[in-house]
């Protein structure tokens, strides 16, 4: 291939054209390293990462798992749920993540962030981003060409990038793991859709950094699910379709599994198709029905839409196991109740076009891998949306009646597989024989003369991989060449995604076709790309690891976000301390009152009884006046003051003292007294 300088800039021209005229011998390099991210554990290969966790960072729900002593555990959050909503909310008092955030969305739609995975790593002007903004109740703004969310934090407008919001969700997963393990966690394996491009993968790694996690691997979700599925399979080779229909993304992968070796043969999918799209169809139907009945259009009412979205998701789940469901919302709008019946048949009718749309990527992976339907041994269902009966029916019908395997929990399979990969990296027992070969999802190449896309690494090539090729100039005495790096499957570079560009300068004057410029693409196990160009005559080299040209975060931005994440964590800790101190004081005061008015009061002198009641009432009145404004130390001081009043009196009954111990009151006494009166409320 040759570089060509045009008036519009320096481009590339195929070498064969100049070769024919100049008889220049070009030697393409064939050193493609088909080494994969091999998960074979050797004694010298494992670094001491401590416990490495596996995280499925989902569009609607996230899940965290860990492998300990050869056993993989899916970890439950503080609500006891094994999957956590990928929601972050901001109130005037605190930041909420997970179930707590999702539960208050109807009352606080503009400050409750969800579906952030649909925005991460993309440009603000991307068609998909603009389409999503129309459906999101919170404000999405343009920040340096990238989407960001604007919320009100303590009365002030604050802007968060998708990486920051995702970092908060990853931080929640980290906390769940640390609560379970009782130790700090610093390393993780995080999954992404197979069709995520380079920018989206790097943005996900940045989110991990913001959360205080070193993301050791970015793993394709279907690949992780295949690990979960394949651990107990037989030794003979299996061809498996992994059909992953989640909340916001859809992926299909064709994998072969043999003797513990996983190889991704082909991947396809849609980054904007999932359960939430099915929910929106229900929401639109409910809006239409409500308008017809009551003449009120709620399509621009964010609070009403949040209520509809919540009920639509419930209805969708119910219809996977029953033929109809009732959707009822009291005082939906203007005091008017909403009451509608949705049948499974109507739900299927509303979404049939989307259900059928999922079969297109299935066809594509079969074409790409050169297999026929009959060659597929197993169909694996992943993602909560695969519970929909019509989805299963259409897929099984496409494969001529072959039944889909339902042996793994579709919500947990991806996190399970991520934890197995994490276990390999941390040196866990029981995974020595697992090998994983992953592939790149999109073709990578450079622009040549005429705007042609010239591939170097074709899609579905096993990674990590490294490919090099010799190019040359197409203009006499050309001193500079421009390398434009693209990803995509289109023939013309303008129809593909520009990853980045750089110049190689200082090429000595020479006739066209004489300089030899070696361009090397190195794609690592996370799908992160480094491109270099070397003038073989002078040895001069330039390179790029695709970063800001793709709208990624700068190190300064990451550092700032890490600092802000730590600040939020500190604020969260302060709020938690305040709430605990406040509850401790309130419980203590009420406990004193109840006991004085109960059995304890019968044993007290009237003066002591009055002293305790007055002290407790004073504290409760103070709490009413200062409930929100006081800080943890204020509550602790009040607790100590009340304890000093109560201790001399209660010690007469329980300690046999004469009351003179008040002057000798110390922290130990406070703890003992506090233990007596303070209990968790049921």
Swiss-Prot record:
The chaperone activity is regulated by ATP-induced allosteric coupling of the nucleotide-binding (NBD) and substrate-binding (SBD) domains. In the ADP-bound and nucleotide-free (apo) states, the two domains have little interaction. In contrast, in the ATP-bound state the two domains are tightly coupled, which results in drastically accelerated kinetics in both binding and release of polypeptide substrates. J domain-containing co-chaperones stimulate the ATPase activity and are required for efficient substrate recognition. Belongs to the heat shock protein 70 family. Keywords: ATP-binding, Chaperone, Endoplasmic reticulum, Hydrolase, Nucleotide-binding, Signal, Stress response. NCBIfam families: PRK00290.1 (NF001413). The keyword Transmembrane helix does not apply. Interacts with EPS1, PDI1 and YOS9. Probably plays a role in facilitating the assembly of multimeric protein complexes inside the ER. Is required for secretory polypeptide translocation. May physically associate with SEC63 protein in the endoplasmic reticulum and this interaction may be regulated by ATP hydrolysis. This is Endoplasmic reticulum chaperone BiP. InterPro entries: ATPase_NBD, BIP_NBD, Heat_shock_70_CS, HSP70_C_sf, HSP70_peptide-bd_sf, Hsp_70_fam. Residues 420-520 are annotated as: Substrate-binding (SBD). It catalyses: ATP + H2O = ADP + phosphate + H(+). SUPFAM superfamilies: Actin-like ATPase domain (SSF53067), Heat shock protein 70kD (HSP70), C-terminal subdomain (SSF100934), Heat shock protein 70kD (HSP70), peptide-binding domain (SSF100920). It holds the Pfam family HSP70. Its EC number is 3.6.4.10. Coiled coil: none annotated. ATP binds at residues 58-61, 117, 247-249, 313-320, 384-387. It is an enzyme of class 3 (hydrolase). GO terms for cellular component: cytoplasm; endoplasmic reticulum; endoplasmic reticulum chaperone complex; endoplasmic reticulum lumen; endoplasmic reticulum membrane; luminal surveillance complex; membrane; nucleus.
């Amino acid at each position: 291939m040759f570089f060509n300088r045009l008036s519009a800039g320096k481009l590339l021209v195929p070498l064969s054209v100049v070769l024919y005229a100049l008889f220049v011998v070009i030697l393409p390099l064939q050193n493609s390293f088909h080494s994969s991210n091999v998960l074979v554990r050797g004694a010298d290969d494992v670094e001491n990462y401590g416990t490495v966790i596996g995280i499925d960072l989902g569009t609607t729900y996230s899940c965290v798992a860990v492998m300990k002593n050869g056993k993989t555990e899916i970890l439950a959050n503080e609500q006891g749920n094994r999957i956590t909503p990928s929601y972050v909310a901001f109130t005037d008092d605190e930041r909420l993540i997970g179930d707590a955030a999702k539960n208050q969305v109807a009352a606080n739609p503009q400050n409750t962030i969800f579906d952030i995975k649909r925005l991460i790593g993309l440009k603000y002007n991307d068609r998909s981003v603009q389409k999503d903004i129309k459906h999101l109740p919170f404000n999405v703004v343009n920040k340096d060409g990238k989407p960001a969310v604007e919320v009100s934090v303590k009365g002030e407008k604050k802007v968060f990038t998708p990486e920051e919001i995702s970092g908060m969700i990853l931080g929640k997963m980290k906390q769940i793991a640390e609560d379970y393990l009782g130790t700090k966690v610093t390393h993780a394996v995080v999954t992404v859709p197979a069709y995520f491009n380079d920018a989206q993968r790097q943005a996900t790694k940045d989110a991990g950094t913001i959360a205080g996690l070193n993301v050791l691997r970015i793993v394709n979700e279907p690949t992780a699910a295949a690990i979960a599925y394949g651990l107990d399979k037989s030794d003979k080779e299996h061809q498996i379709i992994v059909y992953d229909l989640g909340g916001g993304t859809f992926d299909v992968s064709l994998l072969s599994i043999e003797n513990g070796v996983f190889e991704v043969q082909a991947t396809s999918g849609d980054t904007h198709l999932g359960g939430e799209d099915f929910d929106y169809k229900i929401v639109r139907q409910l809006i239409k029905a409500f308008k017809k009945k009551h003449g009120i259009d709620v399509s621009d009412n964010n609070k009403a839409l949040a209520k509809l979205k919540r009920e639509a998701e419930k209805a969708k789940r119910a219809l996977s196991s029953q033929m109809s469901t009732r959707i009822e919302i009291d005082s939906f709008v203007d005091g008017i109740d909403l009451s509608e019946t949705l049948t499974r048949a109507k739900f299927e009718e509303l979404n049939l076009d989307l259900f059928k749309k999922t079969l297109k990527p299935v066809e594509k992976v079969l074409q790409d891998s050169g297999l026929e339907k009959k060659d597929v041994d197993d169909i694996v269902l992943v993602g909560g949306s695969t519970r929909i009966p019509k989805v299963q029916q259409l897929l099984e019908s496409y494969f001529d009646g072959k039944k889909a395997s339902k042996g793994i929990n579709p919500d947990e399979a991806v996190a399970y597989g991520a934890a197995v990969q994490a276990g390999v990296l941390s040196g866990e027992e029981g995974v020595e024989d697992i090998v994983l070969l992953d592939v790149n999802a999109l073709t990578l190449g450079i622009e040549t003369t005429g705007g042609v896309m010239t591939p170097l690494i074709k899609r579905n090539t096993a990674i990590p991989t490294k490919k090099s090729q010799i190019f040359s100039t197409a203009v006499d005495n050309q001193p500079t060449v421009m390398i434009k790096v693209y990803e995509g499957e289109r023939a013309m570079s303008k129809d593909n995604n520009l990853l980045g560009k750089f110049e190689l300068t200082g090429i000595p004057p020479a006739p066209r076709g004489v300089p030899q410029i070696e361009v090397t693409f190195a794609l690592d196990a996370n799908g992160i790309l480094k491109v270099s160009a070397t003038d073989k005559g002078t040895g001069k080299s330039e390179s790029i690891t695709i970063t800001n040209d793709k709208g990624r975060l700068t190190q300064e931005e990451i550092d700032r976000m890490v600092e802000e994440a730590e600040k939020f964590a500190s604020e969260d800790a302060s709020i938690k301390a305040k709430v605990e101190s406040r509850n401790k004081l309130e419980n203590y005061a009420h406990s004193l009152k109840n006991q004085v008015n109960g059995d304890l009061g019968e044993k007290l002198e009237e003066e002591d009884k009055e002293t305790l009641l007055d002290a407790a009432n004073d504290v409760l009145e103070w709490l009413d006046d200062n409930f929100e404004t006081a800080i943890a130390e204020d509550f602790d001081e009040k607790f100590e003051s009340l304890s000093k009043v109560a201790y001399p009196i209660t010690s007469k009954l329980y300690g046999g003292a004469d009351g003179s111990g008040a002057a000798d009151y110390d922290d130990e006494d406070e703890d003992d007294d506090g233990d007596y009166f303070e209990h968790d409320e049921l």
